[in-house]
């Protein structure tokens, strides 16, 4: 594994570079997933994210730790989760052949042990897709996907502990764009999201169902499903 830790996507990409690695199956991804789940010496940090036991101490020292009830509200987990899910969204956008952007304020944050978020984004500057004040307003959104015309396809705000209302205010200012708007957070914050969406200031967002809530668990699952789709020559 790269640096002792890797997503299933990274494992999938790198394992075929090994000359001695031969697969007698048409579904190698499923085999890889089964192997990492059941091989001694490999442990799961999150769904779709695995590490070597021999690197556990080093990884934990770098803030890459298994979340539990005791540490879930710690700063180290907050920092790790925010950068990790930004990284997943950047990878998923690229798999869907979209351009991806992460703000400059986050570009030097580490995604696992190998990459910076700035290295994962496909464009280094946000496109001038509209009036300067609107482009500037969107430039701090955690992850943006752009279509082939350099127009916003999806806005994502990752909310581990910060106030969801701040993200909704951004979305409110950008509601005239035909782009998906998504709050990514722990499922336990879903009720808070619904409560904030009912504020009068966001009545238009609520009425038009402009903002979706995506739980970490759902994102993890969709990331894995997106990887599985990559093995097919044609996807319906």
Predicted regions and their residues:
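Positively charged, polyanion-binding regions of nucleic-acid-associated proteins
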Residues: 1-9, 13-14, 18
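Active-site metal-binding core of divalent-cation-utilizing nuclease and nuclease-like domains
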Residues: 73-78, 94, 102-150, 223-233
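A structural signal for short, well-ordered beta-strand segments and their strand-loop junctions
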Residues: 7, 100-103, 183-184
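Catalytic cores of nucleic-acid endonucleases
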Residues: 121, 127-141, 147-215
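Nuclease catalytic cores
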Residues: 32, 63-105
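Charged low-complexity interaction tracts in eukaryotic proteins
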Residues: 9, 18-68
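Amphipathic coiled-coil/heptad-repeat helices and related helical stalk/stem segments
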Residues: 28, 85-86, 139, 167
């Amino acid at each position: 594994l790269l640096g002792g830790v890797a997503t299933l996507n990274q494992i999938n990409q790198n394992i075929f570079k090994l000359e001695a690695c031969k697969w007698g199956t048409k579904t190698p991804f499923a085999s890889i997933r089964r192997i990492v789940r059941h091989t001694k010496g490999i442990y799961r940090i999150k769904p779709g994210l695995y590490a070597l036991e021999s690197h556990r101490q080093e990884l934990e020292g770098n803030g890459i730790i298994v979340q539990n009830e005791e540490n879930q509200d710690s700063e180290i987990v907050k920092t790790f989760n925010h950068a990790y899910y930004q990284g997943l969204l950047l990878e998923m956008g690229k798999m869907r052949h979209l351009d991806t952007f992460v703000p400059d304020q986050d570009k030097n944050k580490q995604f696992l042990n190998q990459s910076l978020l700035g290295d994962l984004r496909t464009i280094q500057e946000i496109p001038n897709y509209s009036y300067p004040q609107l482009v500037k307003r969107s430039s701090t959104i955690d992850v943006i996907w752009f279509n082939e015309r350099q127009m916003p396809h999806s806005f994502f705000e990752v909310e581990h502990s910060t106030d969801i209302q701040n993200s909704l205010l951004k979305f409110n200012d950008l509601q005239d764009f035909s782009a998906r708007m998504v709050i990514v957070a722990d499922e336990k914050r879903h009720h808070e999201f619904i409560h904030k969406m009912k504020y009068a200031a966001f009545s238009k967002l609520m009425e038009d169902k402009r903002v979706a809530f995506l739980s970490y668990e759902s994102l993890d699952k969709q990331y894995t499903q997106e990887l599985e789709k990559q093995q097919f020559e044609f996807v319906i």
